[in-house]
Amino acid sequence: MSNHWLLPENIADVLPSEARKIEELRRRMLDLFRTYGYELVMPPMLEYLESLLTGTGHDLDLRTLKLVDQLSGRTMGLRADITPQVARIDAHLLNRPGVTRLCYAGNVLHARPAGFHATREPIQIGAEIYGHAGLEADIEIQDLMLAALQAAGLSDVRIDMCHAGILEALLAGLPSIRKIEDALFAALETKDVPALRELTVGMPQTERDALLALPTLYGGVDVIDRARATLPASPAIGRALDELAALAVQVRGASVNIDLSDLRGYHYHSGVMFAAYVAGLPNYVARGGRYDKVGEAFGRARPATGFSLDLREVAALSPVEVRAQAIFAPWDADPALRAAISALRAAGEIVIQSLPGHTHELDEFNCDRQLVRQDAGWAVVPR
């Protein structure tokens, strides 16, 4: 039996009902971003590998599919994340002074799925602010992320916050940590305290105690006060906790948790990191944070903060109903009918003309009206 219809693992077609909802949410979110002053950019699907991975962490390299350009012989990559591309556009192509707000929407491709059931072809949409180092930019980005989730009909949202500066300060005096860095991050992210105890044997006691405490520093905003009492009283850690406290009180329309061991994207971020969750689901639905160092690789270090989400994931969770109202028209050679259909379509109506010999209903549309011939010509009436 032929299996030419099979697709690669974790790759799937988007069928009409899902595509309809994804497109509706994409339009809603891009329209929302525009009301905040964000400009749409469309980076290419593939770039030379050195450009695509510049300023990013090792994780992105592993997720990037590589191929050889038959024109130049150079290695290219299919993008696994649009955010570094937008940073390149801001730093190298636009090169504007002051604040720049950019947004994007497009497919990305992962060499490996992020999870057991995760797609390898997410549809990523997001927004970025460049040029402002203050917390005002982070507050705006978090507001925009929550507004985007609200536009998708998601409620009971929780934001988990962390700060890359805390771990950076703890590891600053431990150059030998690079040998166990990946294992250390994995243990912190999974809150595997026994593994942490084993990995931190031989470290200075102050840093070891702090690293072992990070997985326990999870919960409400009061965690910030617990962290001040538990972690070393360094200026860098104090600033990071101050920023988390200042951001937490500004969140509207969501509850706030602090999770000081949620370090996904640590190599990429330079400050506050945050993720949005909805009730009953273990995985985040949107994620973002500050990444001031990315543009430096393109010759222009700029403060930057942003967020992104996967439209396919959000559409699967969204209660939004998208079934367009349409007008049913018979097939007839009457020029007046063709003129009536053209006029309705020009006015933005969906008109579906029945082809000869077919009487089935289309589940894609709700044909609640129909065109019928009357004495005065063709008219729209309830169906």
Curated annotation (Swiss-Prot):
Miscellaneous field: This function is generally fulfilled by the C-terminal part of HisG, which is missing in some bacteria such as this one.
Compartments, record wording: Cytoplasm
Protein purpose: Required for the first step of histidine biosynthesis. May allow the feedback regulation of ATP phosphoribosyltransferase activity by histidine.
Originating organism: Cupriavidus necator (strain ATCC 17699 / DSM 428 / KCTC 22496 / NCIMB 10442 / H16 / Stanier 337) (Ralstonia eutropha)
Gene that specifies this protein: hisZ
Principal location listed in the UniProt entry: cytoplasm
NCBIfam families: hisZ_biosyn_reg, PRK12292.1-1, PRK12421.1
Record-given protein name: ATP phosphoribosyltransferase regulatory subunit
Keyword line: Amino-acid biosynthesis, Cytoplasm, Histidine biosynthesis
SUPFAM superfamilies, alphabetized: Class II aaRS and biotin synthetases
Quaternary organization: Heteromultimer composed of HisG and HisZ subunits.
